[in-house]
Curated annotation (Swiss-Prot):
Organism in which the protein naturally occurs: Homo sapiens
Cysteine disulfide partners in this protein: C43-C108
Function: V region of the variable domain of immunoglobulin light chains that participates in the antigen recognition. Immunoglobulins, also known as antibodies, are membrane-bound or secreted glycoproteins produced by B lymphocytes. In the recognition phase of humoral immunity, the membrane-bound immunoglobulins serve as receptors which, upon binding of a specific antigen, trigger the clonal expansion and differentiation of B lymphocytes into immunoglobulins-secreting plasma cells.
Start and end residues of each stretch annotated as Framework-1: 21-43
Keyword Magnesium set for record: no
Stretch list, region Framework-2: 55-69
Protein name per its UniProtKB record: Immunoglobulin kappa variable 1-8
Region (Complementarity-determining-1): 44-54
Length: 115
């Protein structure tokens, strides 16, 4: 049986699990801070990702280090001054009292869907 192309297109739109690429936006893109400061970094997803979000810390010349997964679960060995919150589209990484060893680049990553 032949299915008209228009109908096939509509059916594809309704396929469960069919998703567009998810765009992640972090803010601020850069900032200055001093030891002892409370630092907050936000991450926004272009569509809902439930709690499928991880935060990483990367220092120059080193591989990224996982800090937080499932939006708020601290990876073993990560100091408790790091915390994560949020669900859906809006997420936050907070460092409650910045230490000298925390000066680094921080990234969020969604793992709700893959390209």
């Amino acid at each position: 049986m032949r299915v008209p192309a228009q109908l096939l297109g509509l059916l594809l739109l309704w396929l469960p699990g069919a998703r567009c690429a998810i765009r992640m936006t972090q803010s601020p893109s850069s900032f200055s801070a001093s030891t002892g400061d409370r630092v907050t970094i936000t991450c926004r997803a272009s569509q809902g990702i439930s709690s499928y979000l991880a935060w990483y810390q990367q220092k120059p010349g080193k591989a990224p280090k996982l800090l937080i997964y499932a939006a708020s679960t601290l990876q073993s060995g990560v100091p408790s001054r790091f915390s994560g919150s949020g669900s859906g589209t809006d997420f936050t990484l907070t460092i409650s009292c910045l230490q000298s060893e925390d000066f680094a680049t921080y990234y969020c990553q969604q793992y709700y869907s893959y390209p």
